[in-house]
């Protein structure tokens, strides 16, 4: 399938060493090694990329109990923006994307750029860069335009707001 030597961390987006180290320690304490191991297993299985979200649910051993008829409530056509809280981290994102992908293939997930390293979902991710560099600002403007294009084409945008890090006082386009 793809190279499993991806940078499996969010620490690279932090500009100062203290922040980087804090994130690395937090990742190690909250299951990063287990997630990396599951991802490496997934790569060895060489599964079709379109099944990534469903395969992830199996690998993570998630027992998904959809609320009422959640899949049936997803419109099959037309513009759609899905905004969801993600109190359970990766499990929430995997679950939402799995449900959406059962109905639609014209979806894009706006998320941290580090997640775009997963080859199976690279084309489904619109990356955000949370650093304060000029390159990050230009990249994020490009991502915003990409999201607008998806919606203008009657596609689906999925996003998980992250509070303070998802806001910027002013961005010039």
Predicted regions and their residues:
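Soluble catalytic domains of membrane acyltransferases
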Residues: 63-173
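Membrane-anchoring hydrophobic helices of lipid-metabolizing enzymes
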Residues: 1-83, 93-95, 102-104, 122-123
């Amino acid at each position: 399938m793809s190279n499993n030597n991806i940078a499996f961390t969010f620490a690279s987006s932090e500009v100062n060493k203290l922040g980087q180290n804090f994130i690395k320690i937090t990742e190690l304490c909250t299951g990063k090694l287990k997630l990396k191991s599951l991802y490496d297993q997934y790569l060895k299985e060489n599964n079709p990329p379109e099944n990534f979200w469903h395969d992830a649910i199996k690998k993570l051993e998630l027992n998904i109990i959809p609320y009422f008829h959640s899949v049936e409530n997803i419109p099959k056509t037309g513009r759609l923006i899905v905004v969801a809280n993600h109190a359970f981290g990766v499990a929430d994102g995997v679950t939402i994307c799995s449900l959406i992908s059962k109905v639609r293939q014209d979806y894009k997930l706006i998320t941290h750029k580090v997640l775009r390293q997963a080859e199976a979902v690279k084309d489904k991710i619109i990356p955000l860069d949370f650093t304060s560099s000029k390159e990050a600002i230009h990249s994020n403007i490009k991502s915003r335009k990409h999201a607008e294009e998806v919606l203008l084409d009657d596609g689906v945008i999925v996003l998980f707001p992250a509070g303070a890090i998802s806001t910027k006082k002013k961005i010039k386009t």
